[in-house]
């Protein structure tokens, strides 16, 4: 029985109860959200190391995903395992293995072993990889793709990205809608190239019922990928993007009827003035399915600092209702990220998600910020470290340049909070400034 099927029968599962406790909401709230398809809990029972269940969707905190995985040029399994550890250490709510080089099955197994949070994959990468090794990518059969999906389910993958909206009809819309950067989704591009070369329909769309059968068997959440997402501001919110979203909205309903959890992936390169519209359109067309976005990236020109640019867009999108942010790293658009890049990306997007939670009125986020302010006013450094999103970094910076006073080394005896208190109460909590 899937989480969705259990929720519809009125059953509160162990995972629902866990999510409710973590989020500070009632188990019934979570159950109702899952039953309605507005919350998903990626949870494949075969993922034995998964202990930190995550709820993604409306009424819950904004989540962050961290991508990792090998590439054609760089295959270092231990480094990818380290990336997974680093991502989880700094707060990634889920991780995705996007490996395209080396022994993909072995790499996935190693990452599953250390992934205490849900793990996602993009099965077409492995299906393409196998076909390319045998002959060429275009030789991939539909059966081979579904075989890979089945294998991922058996191994314990919790959610899979499937580019079901890249249909022949939507590719016609794309071809008739001039773009600056074409198709930028790797999985979507692979599927589109395969379809155009062979003149065949997307098997994930044509055989969607088969996909649902596999997903239901392993309770794999379907992450319906946006293969036609815009890859530049010039292409944002165009006809191809919306045409694909309309198709995805229909498939969300089919997934729900089949008892399969589904969330929807979104852009991408979107200017700030279009972020709200993109979130609202997605929620409207998909029956408020959880929205999992890449960024959003509000400028095309931040190469080397896309994690910062993406966090800006992600915070705004989260405020408007996006449910999970896929991080960007400093290496985005430039190369395969290192563990340090992963750390920087997760930190930037956890801050963005937290900012969105505050704006959405999340009670726990608001309380944490209030307590931080109180500790700051008291010059309670241990209290501040405990409440900081990243305590170790806060402590390191404080101790790196200490002060002779109780304040920090920026103001020292000129700390305004201390000075005002000194006047109001007739004494200071530390030394008054001297010449």
Swiss-Prot record:
Record bears the keyword Coiled coil: no
Keywords: 4Fe-4S, Iron, Iron-sulfur, Lyase, Metal-binding, S-adenosyl-L-methionine, Thiamine biosynthesis, Zinc
Main enzyme class: lyase
Cofactors, names only: [4Fe-4S] cluster
Cofactor comment text: Binds 1 [4Fe-4S] cluster per subunit. The cluster is coordinated with 3 cysteines and an exchangeable S-adenosyl-L-methionine.
Residues bound to substrate: 67, 96, 125, 163, 185-187, 226-229, 265, 292
Gene Ontology molecular function, alphabetical: 4 iron, 4 sulfur cluster binding; carbon-carbon lyase activity; zinc ion binding
GO BP, sorted A to Z: thiamine biosynthetic process; thiamine diphosphate biosynthetic process
Keyword Oxidoreductase: no
Pathway(s) it belongs to: Cofactor biosynthesis; thiamine diphosphate biosynthesis
Organism superkingdom: Bacteria
Binding site for Zn(2+): 269, 333
EC number: 4.1.99.17
Recorded catalytic activity of this chain's protein: 5-amino-1-(5-phospho-beta-D-ribosyl)imidazole + S-adenosyl-L-methionine = 4-amino-2-methyl-5-(phosphooxymethyl)pyrimidine + CO + 5'-deoxyadenosine + formate + L-methionine + 3 H(+)
Residues reported in the UniProt entry to bind [4Fe-4S] cluster: 408, 411, 415
Family classification: Belongs to the ThiC family.
HAMAP family: ThiC
Function in brief: Catalyzes the synthesis of the hydroxymethylpyrimidine phosphate (HMP-P) moiety of thiamine from aminoimidazole ribotide (AIR) in a radical S-adenosyl-L-methionine (SAM)-dependent reaction.
UniProt-recorded name of the protein: Phosphomethylpyrimidine synthase
UniProt source species: Thermus thermophilus (strain ATCC BAA-163 / DSM 7039 / HB27)
């Amino acid at each position: 029985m899937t989480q969705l099927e259990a929720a519809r029968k009125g059953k509160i599962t162990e995972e629902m109860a866990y999510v409710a406790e973590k989020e500070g909401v009632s188990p019934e709230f979570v159950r109702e959200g899952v039953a309605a398809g507005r919350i998903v809990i990626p949870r494949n029972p075969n993922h034995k190391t998964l202990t930190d269940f995550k709820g993604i969707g409306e009424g819950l905190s904004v989540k962050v995903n961290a991508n990792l995985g090998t590439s054609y040029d760089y295959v270092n399994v231990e480094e990818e395992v380290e990336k997974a550890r680093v991502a989880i250490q700094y707060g990634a709510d889920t991780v995705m293995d996007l490996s395209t080089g080396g022994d993909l099955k072995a790499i996935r197994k190693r990452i599953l072993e250390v992934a205490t949070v849900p793990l996602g994959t993009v099965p077409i990468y492995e299906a393409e990889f196998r076909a390319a090794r045998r002959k060429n990518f275009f030789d991939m059969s539909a059966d081979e793709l579904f075989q890979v999906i089945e294998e991922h389910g058996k191994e314990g993958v919790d959610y899979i990205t499937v580019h079901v909206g890249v249909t022949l009809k939507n590719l016609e819309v794309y071809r008739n809608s001039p773009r600056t950067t074409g198709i930028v989704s790797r999985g979507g591009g692979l599927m589109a190239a395969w379809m155009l070369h062979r003149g065949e329909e997307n098997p994930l769309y044509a055989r969607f019922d088969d996909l649902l059968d596999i997903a239901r068997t392993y309770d794999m959440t379907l992450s319906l990928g946006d293969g036609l997402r815009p890859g530049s501001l010039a292409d944002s919110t165009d006809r191809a993007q919306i045409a694909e979203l309309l198709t995805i909205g229909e498939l969300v309903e089919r997934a729900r009827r089949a008892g399969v959890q589904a969330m929807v992936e979104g852009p991408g390169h979107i200017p700030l003035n279009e972020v709200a519209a993109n979130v609202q359109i997605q929620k409207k067309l998909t029956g408020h399915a959880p929205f999992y976005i890449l960024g959003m990236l509000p400028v095309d020109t931040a190469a080397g600092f896309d994690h910062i640019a993406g966090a800006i867009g992600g915070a705004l999108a989260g405020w408007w209702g996006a449910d999970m942010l896929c991080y960007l790293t400093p290496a985005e658009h430039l190369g395969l990220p290192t563990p340090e890049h992963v750390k920087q990306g997760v930190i930037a997007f956890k801050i963005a998600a937290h900012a969105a939670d505050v704006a959405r009125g999340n009670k726990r986020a608001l309380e944490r910020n209030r307590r931080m302010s109180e500790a700051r006013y008291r010059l309670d450094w241990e209290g501040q470290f405990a409440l900081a999103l990243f305590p170790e970094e806060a402590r390191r910076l404080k101790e790196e340049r200490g002060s002779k006073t109780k304040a920090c080394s920026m103001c020292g005896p000129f700390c305004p909070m201390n000075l005002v208190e000194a006047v109001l109460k007739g004494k200071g909590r530390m030394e008054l400034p001297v010449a």
